[in-house]
Amino acid sequence: MDTMGRHVISELWGCDFDKLNDIDFIEKTFVDAALKSGAEIREVAFHKFAPQGVSGVVIISESHLTIHTFPEHGYASIDVYTCGHLDPTIAADYIAEMLGAQTRETIELPRGMRPIEVKKAQAL
């Protein structure tokens, strides 16, 4: 079935505290992940929280990559959404590897497959 895009959502557990808390490392990892997948980078924005944690986004011509880290839990949530021919798993796999994730739970959603008709339930 044709889709407009693919959206990979990953829960990363058992990640290294220092990596999850290092804004420069996270930003470089995400830029590298986008480039490895063949994406064209448009904008990059990351923020470091106190006392810990990083959130950020890499906007690509084909959509986006995002992260929210919780170093105190060894946890990061990532989204990689691509349109067109790009494979989002390339970037998601690279990010999980770079963060040293011990456990990874991932789902992939096809996006833009056409509107879904939802019918109202009939009362009995």
From Swiss-Prot:
Protein's UniProt keywords contain Cell membrane: no
Cofactor(s) recorded in Swiss-Prot or TrEMBL: pyruvate
Pfam families on file: AdoMet_dc
Residues the record lists as Pyruvic acid (Ser) modifications: 63
Keywords: Autocatalytic cleavage, Decarboxylase, Lyase, Polyamine biosynthesis, Pyruvate, S-adenosyl-L-methionine, Schiff base, Spermidine biosynthesis, Zymogen
EC number: 4.1.1.50
Family note: Belongs to the prokaryotic AdoMetDC family. Type 1 subfamily.
Domain of life: Bacteria
Pathway(s) served: Amine and polyamine biosynthesis; S-adenosylmethioninamine biosynthesis; S-adenosylmethioninamine from S-adenosyl-L-methionine: step 1/1
Record note on cofactor: Binds 1 pyruvoyl group covalently per subunit.
Reactions accelerated catalytically: S-adenosyl-L-methionine + H(+) = S-adenosyl 3-(methylsulfanyl)propylamine + CO2
Post-translational modification: Is synthesized initially as an inactive proenzyme. Formation of the active enzyme involves a self-maturation process in which the active site pyruvoyl group is generated from an internal serine residue via an autocatalytic post-translational modification. Two non-identical subunits are generated from the proenzyme in this reaction, and the pyruvate is formed at the N-terminus of the alpha chain, which is derived from the carboxyl end of the proenzyme.
Site residues, Cleavage (non-hydrolytic): 62-63
PANTHER family: S-ADENOSYLMETHIONINE DECARBOXYLASE PROENZYME
Segment forming the signal sequence: none
Name of the protein in its database record: S-adenosylmethionine decarboxylase proenzyme
Protein role: Catalyzes the decarboxylation of S-adenosylmethionine to S-adenosylmethioninamine (dcAdoMet), the propylamine donor required for the synthesis of the polyamines spermine and spermidine from the diamine putrescine.
Subunit structure: Heterotetramer of two alpha and two beta chains arranged as a dimer of alpha/beta heterodimers.
GO cellular component terms given for this protein: cytosol
BP GO terms, sorted: spermidine biosynthetic process
Protein's UniProt keywords contain Membrane: no
Annotated catalytic residues: 63, 68, 83
GO MF annotation list: adenosylmethionine decarboxylase activity
